[in-house]
Structures are given as structure tokens and as C-alpha cells.
């Protein structure tokens, strides 16, 4: 994949598992999305193993996308570089009880694109620049059209004037530690148990 600091970079951090993670939604629209945004030369980095890795490689070979798409086996160090280097994280999961990448990415200023389900629903709010709220992009229905819509929303955000875009990324990075930390989680569990027991916990 060519080095292009001005190109939007989409990062796939999870295994390429068609049962849960939804890579088929992306492969269905990858050619169309790249050609629609050809002047922006969008790039995709897959650092993941799984049954759809061969499908991704076949698309790259068939359309000669080697300068735009990299498909690599999972490597922890490379994955961490992906979080830091990318603009967006792709998580179109069919179901996701928890999920971690959508919480890791914003710490680096990398915004998640997710299917609105399970833990992704709990942790990703669709970005609203005018209201100064949200931390990513979510779509309601598990299909390629939904993912395509969310990726288009992400591209619209990417093309905003740099000061406006950077202000949102800065806000999201600053809010991320307060949203996702062990102290908040522990306090939430304590509150839940106290409500169930109808008394304070003795710690």
C-alpha cells in the first residue's frame, strides 16, 4: 500500500469472521466505495485473520487495489500502529456483546464505524458536528447499504475544513478516558448492587 498522509485510512482491527464480524458487508461495497471516492484515494488496512481474508485478497488482486488496500495477518504491534495511524475503524458486526476496538480507537483520534448493536450501541454515539456530540458513525440495519451509508458519513466528516474536524477529534479524544475506565465501571457495578440490595455495600 502506498504511503499517502492525505488519504483517508480505514482500519479493520477484528478477525475476518463472516458469522459475527460482518466483513461480507464491506467486501460487497469495497469496489463501489473506492471508485466513488477515487479522487480521495481511500485506503484500507486489514490486520486480521479469518475466513474472509482470502476474499479480501481476491478483491485486491482482481481490481489491482494493491496501492490502496493492505491485507495482513494479525500482529499485535502492527494492530496498535493501525489504531494510531487510521482515521476510521470498521466494526460492522452482526452482534457484539462488548467490543474493544471502538473504545481503543478514539483514544488515538480514530473514529469507529459500527453496526448499532450490543456493546457497540452502548459505546458509540453517532457524530453530530452541529450539536458537538457523538464519537463515531453507526448504522441501524445489518446490511451493506447501511455500512455504505455510515462510511459516506465518515467521508463527509473527513472532508470538513481541518479546524472544524480537528476540534471534534480533540473533543472525542479528551472525552474518551472519562467514558471508558475501570473506576467508572466499578462505580456503576457498585451502584447496581446497592440498588438490588437496597443498602450500601460494605467495602
List the predicted regions and their residue ranges.
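Conserved donor-binding/catalytic core segment of Leloir-type glycosyltransferases
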Residues: 4-20
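Active-site helix-initiating loop/hinge in glycosyltransferases
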Residues: 21-23, 99, 181
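Nucleotide-activated donor-binding/catalytic signature segment of Leloir-type glycosyltransferases, i.e.
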Residues: 37-81, 138
Amino acid at each position: 500500500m502506498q504511503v499517502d498522509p492525505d488519504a483517508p485510512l480505514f482500519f479493520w482491527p477484528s478477525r475476518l469472521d463472516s458469522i459475527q464480524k460482518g466483513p461480507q458487508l464491506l467486501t460487497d461495497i469495497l469496489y463501489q466505495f473506492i471508485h466513488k471516492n477515487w479522487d480521495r484515494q481511500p485506503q484500507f488496512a486489514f490486520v486480521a485473520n479469518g475466513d474472509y481474508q482470502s476474499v479480501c485478497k481476491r478483491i485486491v488482486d482482481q481490481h489491482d487495489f494493491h496501492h490502496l488496500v493492505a491485507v495482513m495477518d494479525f500482529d499485535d504491534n502492527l494492530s496498535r500502529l493501525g489504531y494510531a495511524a487510521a482515521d476510521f475503524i470498521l466494526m460492522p458486526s452482526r452482534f457484539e456483546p462488548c467490543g474493544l476496538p471502538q473504545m481503543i480507537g478514539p483514544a488515538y483520534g480514530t473514529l469507529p464505524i459500527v453496526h448499532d448493536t450490543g456493546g457497540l450501541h452502548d459505546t458509540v454515539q453517532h457524530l453530530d458536528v452541529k450539536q458537538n456530540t457523538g464519537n463515531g458513525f453507526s448504522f441501524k440495519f445489518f446490511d451493506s447499504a447501511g455500512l455504505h451509508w455510515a462510511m459516506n458519513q465518515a467521508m463527509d466528516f473527513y472532508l470538513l475544513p481541518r479546524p472544524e474536524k480537528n476540534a471534534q477529534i480533540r473533543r472525542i479524544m479528551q472525552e474518551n478516558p472519562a467514558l471508558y475506565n475501570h473506576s467508572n465501571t466499578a462505580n456503576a457495578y457498585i451502584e447496581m448492587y446497592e440498588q438490588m440490595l437496597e443498602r450500601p455495600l460494605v467495602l
